Amino acid sequence: MSIDIETARRVAKLARIKVEDDALPALAGEFNHILGFIEQLNEVDVDDVEPMTSVTPMRLKRREDVVTDGDQQAAVLSNAPDAREGFFAVPKVVE
């Protein structure tokens, strides 16, 4: 599968990412590079590999489960198209 410039433009629009027209060929190239890597994964022999196992026997690192305030409100709201009084503002959807 090959990604052309129009497909790259459509993906950027769907992802709500502003991409200038002169950057679209590079973006399409990056998409094609990613898809090429994914196609290489199809060549890996996984017949004898159990699903959901790791290639190295490791336990996951665990952390203490504590409640925090997160302190991320400003960072999260900086991505919002419209934020008011510390909350996401969205159009009314119910009459």
UniProtKB/Swiss-Prot annotation:
Keywords: ATP-binding, Ligase, Nucleotide-binding, Protein biosynthesis
InterPro entries found in the cross-reference section: Asp/Glu-ADT_sf_sub_c (IPR036113), GatC (IPR003837)
Database matches in Pfam families: GatC (PF02686)
Enzyme Commission (EC) number: 6.3.5.-
Catalytic activity: L-glutamyl-tRNA(Gln) + L-glutamine + ATP + H2O = L-glutaminyl-tRNA(Gln) + L-glutamate + ADP + phosphate + H(+); L-aspartyl-tRNA(Asn) + L-glutamine + ATP + H2O = L-asparaginyl-tRNA(Asn) + L-glutamate + ADP + phosphate + 2 H(+)
Subunit structure of this chain's protein: Heterotrimer of A, B and C subunits.
Function (record text): Allows the formation of correctly charged Asn-tRNA(Asn) or Gln-tRNA(Gln) through the transamidation of misacylated Asp-tRNA(Asn) or Glu-tRNA(Gln) in organisms which lack either or both of asparaginyl-tRNA or glutaminyl-tRNA synthetases. The reaction takes place in the presence of glutamine and ATP through an activated phospho-Asp-tRNA(Asn) or phospho-Glu-tRNA(Gln).
Family in the record: Belongs to the GatC family.
Protein name, as recorded: Aspartyl/glutamyl-tRNA(Asn/Gln) amidotransferase subunit C
Species the sequence originates in: Dinoroseobacter shibae (strain DSM 16493 / NCIMB 14021 / DFL 12)
